[in-house]
Curated annotation (Swiss-Prot):
One of its GO terms (biological process) is mitochondrial electron transport, ubiquinol to cytochrome c. It comes from Leiothlypis ruficapilla. It is found in: Mitochondrion inner membrane. InterPro entries: Cyt_b/b6_C (IPR005798), Cyt_b/b6_C_sf (IPR036150), Cyt_b/b6_N (IPR005797), Cytb/b6-like_sf (IPR027387), Cytochrome_b (IPR030689), Cytochrome_b_C_euk/bac (IPR048260), Cytochrome_b_N_euk/bac (IPR048259), Di-haem_cyt_TM (IPR016174). GO terms for molecular function: metal ion binding; ubiquinol-cytochrome-c reductase activity. Its main location: mitochondrion. Keywords: Electron transport, Heme, Iron, Membrane, Metal-binding, Mitochondrion, Mitochondrion inner membrane, Respiratory chain, Transmembrane, Transmembrane helix, Transport, Ubiquinone. Its cofactor is heme b. GO terms for cellular component: mitochondrial inner membrane; respiratory chain complex III. This is Cytochrome b. Heme b b566 binds at H98, H197. The cytochrome bc1 complex contains 11 subunits: 3 respiratory subunits (MT-CYB, CYC1 and UQCRFS1), 2 core proteins (UQCRC1 and UQCRC2) and 6 low-molecular weight proteins (UQCRH/QCR6, UQCRB/QCR7, UQCRQ/QCR8, UQCR10/QCR9, UQCR11/QCR10 and a cleavage product of UQCRFS1). This cytochrome bc1 complex then forms a dimer. It is a multi-pass membrane protein.
Amino acid sequence: MALNLRKNHQILKIINDALIDLPAPSNISTWWNFGSLLGICLITQIITGLLLAMHYTADTNLAFSSVAHMCRDVQFGWLIRNLHANGASFFFICIYLHIGRGLYYGSYLNKETWNVGVVLLLALMATAFVGYVLPWGQMSFWGATVITNLFSAIPYIGQTLVEWAWGGFSVDNPTLTRFFALHFLLPFVIVGLTLVHLTFLHETGSNNPLGIPSDCDKIPFHPYYTIKDILGFALMLSLLVSLALFAPNLLGDPENFTPANPLVTPPHIKPEWYFLFAYAILRSIPNKLGGVLALAASILVLFLTPLLHTSKLRSMTFRPLSQILFWTLVANVLILTWVGSQPVEHPFIIIGQLASFTYFTIILVLFPLAAALENKLLKL
């Protein structure tokens, strides 16, 4: 009998075990689609990014012009740029929904998978930040100045660290050059981390909406979830293309159409929409070091969620109190996002401070308390 190449070839076997014969729970919902959507986002960003890098010049005198040249003179350059810029937004939409799914259904109890996932989020945020600097518009320049300056809040070594990151005494040509190098490198780091993420996931298998073991009822990944994923790809890519074609600048800052000028500060320096919640937390603390610590904590707090799980039930499916808290947290993050886009004045300051306080309180205090109370109420 001939060997089945798919199951015996060293490389094809790995692909087979990950994408074809992988045993998957029979009841995972559309919330489980975002992992594969993130994979498509990553592939799209790497392809469009590579094409853009072929025409980009990492020099302060030429960067802005090279991007303009791309949009005017390169075949479909405008489309490639719009897909890349808006692809970043879709990447963050997918990762936030993916994390929300993980929090709701208790997926964070796969600790290794979850921790690698948080590192992936940090890598994605770093990539997006250095990428935003490359067009060398006003918001690129001032965003880079403000965010890199935060490192100067670190006691003793802060200022040295910032000047080392800048490659000089301000954001200038060396900064742009190294940010381009980092923006090229980091997506491949993300690819590597993604493989680690999947390796850990396939050790334990996927969680499911009920949060119960599903070993007794598994189905092969192909054809069931391959077709389901392809539907997700089609929907997301059509949304991305629609945004890139009909409203390419909807999510961008008009300030970035002005070339970078160190002598003119924009009236409102703010990051892209996907960083606004963290930016609001940073701004809500009237102390530089405190703000930086809160900013870091807003993401790093995700590492603590597996340790703060007090419920006897894995998922929130049968936990109404935790559900209320979860959706309050979602609303809270949306409020933070909105506040981050507003100027620093009354009433936005106090709203931001209250929302920041609530964000940490829900995650660190109320989730564990509600879960413990639910154990009592359900006599678990």
